[in-house]
Amino acid sequence: MYFGHIAIYTEHLTAMTDFYCRYFGGTVFYEGVYGDQKSVYIAFDQDCYLELMDKASVGPSPLSPGEERQGLTHIAINAESTARVNELTARLEKDGYPVVWQPTDYGTDRFYESCVLDPDGNRVEICVHEKVLRAERGLG
């Protein structure tokens, strides 16, 4: 089994679409209108996709941008290397996106990641998969 898609309601459909396509290599493969809801589907390298939805009857979140809470707390996107995590984090920061934490090494072969906020204030972790990290460090 694997995740099919993640769906996010947004008041900033264009900005969110641009963010996930420009910085994470997504490609819009479908746009539709269903009553008062507009949806944009963004495909990535694997079978998982992101559905962004703008619906007038869904109000804004009462949470502050980046605020942690029970329930879904972040999206993690795997980068191909630690260098890519560093480069993308620096680019996002330069372009004005809030960085929750800079690239951080959580141990020799476990985690290397940063965290930024998307235009809606959702946390997005930019990670290196454990297998890639181990290979970069010659740990097999």
Segments predicted by a language model, with ranges:
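Exposed loop/turn and edge beta-strand positions of beta-sandwich/beta-sheet ligand-binding modules
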Residues: D36, G71, R110
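Vicinal oxygen chelate
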Residues: T89-G140
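Mid-chain, well-packed structural core segment of small domains
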Residues: I77-T89
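Short, flexible turn/loop "capping" segments at secondary-structure junctions
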Residues: P65-Q70
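Short, flexible active-site-adjacent loop segments at beta-strand->alpha-helix junctions, enriched
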Residues: A7, A56, S81, D120, ...
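Core segments of cupin and vicinal oxygen chelate
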Residues: I8-L50, D54-S57
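N-terminal beta-strand motif that seeds the catalytic metal site of vicinal oxygen chelate
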Residues: M1-T17, L72-I77, E130-G140
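A short, acidic/glycine-rich surface segment
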Residues: Q37, S57-L63, L133-A135
